[in-house]
């Protein structure tokens, strides 16, 4: 499937209609879903109706924006009015939001065509999209492997051309890690840049919505559309949104003007040799293109994982307390009384990983352990942010592999939660610090599985990430490779 800019040109030149483009996406979905299972819900009739409206505008001579008529997939933890939003959980089965999230409202206003809702690990808790109550999504490059998580459905949909672009959410790597595993581009924006109104909360101090796409430019265009201040979100940043496509040129700034720091702590045990090799070649190419490369130490980087697994479950245990079967979603039957109904509903409605994190969070927040765990984790979080601040005094961008490995086999880590958690080792510290980070393809391993490189910048420097990522992308052909489906 073509890029946003290519489809836009096809529409305004009347080479193709919005209905034809939407039908092509829906045909891809019908053909591939039995294998991939990227979508929980496909809104075919609604999508065709939206496409007809776009064609009517074009026929009437109205000027259309870049996203008008572009098929897009939305992760199923982002509320969509009139369309089920399950969060991949039994406890929200058949829940249809009565309101629209800010990001999807912006997309609808821009004329984008929503194809449906994509699969995810339940409430965003997972790194493989195996924790969904409804189905297991597979990797388009190898159907015996995971697509990553928790935005695995969105990443798989984009990689397989079921959708042009997609929205995901990222709490500890849930956009970037699946982007790496599926060979696409994914960006987690600065915390507060994109409104969280209508995003079902997991860990509110880290959750952030962002784009997934096949090219850097498409991610820049999509972020441009969804970013900006929203009074409905108390953590929304009231800052101007720059033109993210303005500096997208194939040439890097004059030699030495962009300084890239390689995070020393990311090259230890557990890093696959194929991932290290691909990343090293990518860094060498960036140096040839004019970047100044140096090694940077972030001493507390490795503390990110244990810190996250105290703070995120603590916030989740509070956020998920609202699901009790009273007003919406699943309700257990044959309860003896109200308290029994609460307990049965939550016991039957939540999956094992969600229960595990609720229990960890409740324990960390309990009276006897609050200071020892939660408060201490918040202090370490501050130290991690300080390490990043010191690093950005020396460099403009930090770089490391997105994940220590390529996509692992389905079921390989299901019985080993700690091994699963380690796949987000490189991405989690970024969320703790509220920084923006982008993953883009930088090669393949010996089995033909994609490898991702992560670029991290200081707050609100997404334009710099896009600029550097675009230069690298255009200097090679990784983004042109497609899975053979």
Swiss-Prot record:
GO BP: any one term: translation
Pfam families: Amidase (PF01425)
Keyword Nucleotide-binding among record annotations: yes
Domain of life: Bacteria
Cross-referenced InterPro entries: Amidase, Amidase_CS, Amidase_dom, AS_sf, GatA
Molecular function, one GO term: glutaminyl-tRNA synthase (glutamine-hydrolyzing) activity
Gene3D superfamilies assigned: Amidase signature (AS) domain
EC number(s) reported in the record: 6.3.5.7
Protein keywords: ATP-binding, Ligase, Nucleotide-binding, Protein biosynthesis
Catalytic residue positions: 75 (charge relay system), 150 (charge relay system), 174 (acyl-ester intermediate)
Reaction catalyzed: L-glutamyl-tRNA(Gln) + L-glutamine + ATP + H2O = L-glutaminyl-tRNA(Gln) + L-glutamate + ADP + phosphate + H(+)
PROSITE patterns with a match to the protein in the record: AMIDASES
The family this protein is said to belong to: Belongs to the amidase family. GatA subfamily.
PANTHER family xref list: GLUTAMYL-TRNA(GLN) AMIDOTRANSFERASE SUBUNIT A, TRANSAMIDASE
Record text on subunit structure and interactions: Heterotrimer of A, B and C subunits.
Function: Allows the formation of correctly charged Gln-tRNA(Gln) through the transamidation of misacylated Glu-tRNA(Gln) in organisms which lack glutaminyl-tRNA synthetase. The reaction takes place in the presence of glutamine and ATP through an activated gamma-phospho-Glu-tRNA(Gln).
Name of the protein in question: Glutamyl-tRNA(Gln) amidotransferase subunit A
Organism: Trichodesmium erythraeum (strain IMS101)
């Amino acid at each position: 499937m073509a890029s946003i800019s290519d489809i836009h040109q096809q529409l305004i030149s009347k080479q193709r209609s919005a209905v034809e483009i939407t039908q092509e996406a829906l045909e891809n979905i019908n053909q591939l879903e039995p294998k991939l299972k990227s979508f929980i819900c496909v809104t075919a009739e609604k999508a065709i109706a939206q496409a007809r409206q776009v064609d009517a505008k074009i026929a009437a001579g109205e000027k259309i924006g870049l996203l008008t008529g572009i098929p897009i997939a939305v992760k199923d933890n982002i509320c969509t009015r009139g369309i089920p939003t399950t969060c991949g959980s039994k406890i929200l089965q058949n829940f249809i939001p009565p309101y629209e999230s800010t990001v999807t409202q912006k997309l609808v206003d821009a004329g984008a065509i929503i194809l449906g809702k994509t699969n995810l690990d339940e409430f965003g808790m997972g790194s493989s999209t195996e924790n969904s109550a409804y189905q297991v999504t597979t990797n388009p490059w190898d159907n015996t492997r995971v697509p990553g998580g928790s935005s695995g459905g969105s990443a798989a949909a984009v990689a397989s051309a079921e959708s042009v672009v997609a929205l995901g959410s990222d709490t500890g790597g849930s956009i970037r890690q699946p982007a790496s595993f599926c060979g696409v581009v994914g960006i987690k924006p600065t915390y507060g840049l994109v409104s969280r109104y209508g995003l079902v909360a997991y860990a509110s101090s880290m959750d952030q919505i962002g784009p997934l796409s096949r090219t850097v430019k498409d991610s820049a265009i999509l972020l441009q559309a969804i970013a900006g201040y929203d009074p409905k979100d108390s953590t929304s940043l009231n800052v101007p949104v720059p033109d993210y496509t303005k500096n997208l040129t194939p040439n890097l700034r004059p030699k030495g003007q962009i300084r890239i720091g390689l995070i020393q702590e990311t090259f230890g045990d557990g890093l696959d040799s194929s991932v290290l090799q691909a990343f090293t070649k990518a860094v060498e190419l960036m140096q040839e293109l004019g970047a100044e490369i140096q090694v940077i130490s972030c001493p507390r980087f490795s503390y990110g994982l244990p810190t996250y697994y105290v703070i995120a479950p603590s916030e989740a245990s509070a956020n998920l307390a609202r699901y009790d079967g009273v007003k919406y979603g699943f309700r257990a039957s044959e309860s003896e009384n109200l308290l029994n109904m609460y307990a049965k509903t939550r016991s039957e409605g939540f999956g094992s990983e969600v229960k595990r994190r609720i229990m960890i969070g409740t324990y960390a927040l309990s009276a006897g352990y609050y200071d020892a765990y939660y408060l201490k984790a918040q202090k370490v979080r501050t130290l991690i942010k300080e390490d990043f601040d010191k690093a950005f005094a020396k460099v403009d961008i930090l770089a490391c592999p997105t994940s220590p490995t390529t996509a692992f086999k389905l079921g390989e880590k299901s019985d080993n939660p700690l091994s699963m958690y380690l796949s987000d080792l490189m991405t989690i510290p970024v969320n703790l610090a509220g920084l923006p980070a982008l993953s883009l393809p930088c090669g393949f391993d010996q089995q033909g599985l994609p490898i991702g490189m992560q670029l991290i910048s200081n707050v609100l420097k997404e334009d710099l990430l896009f600029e550097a990522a675009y230069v690298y992308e255009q200097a090679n052909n990784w983004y042109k490779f497609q899975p053979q489906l």
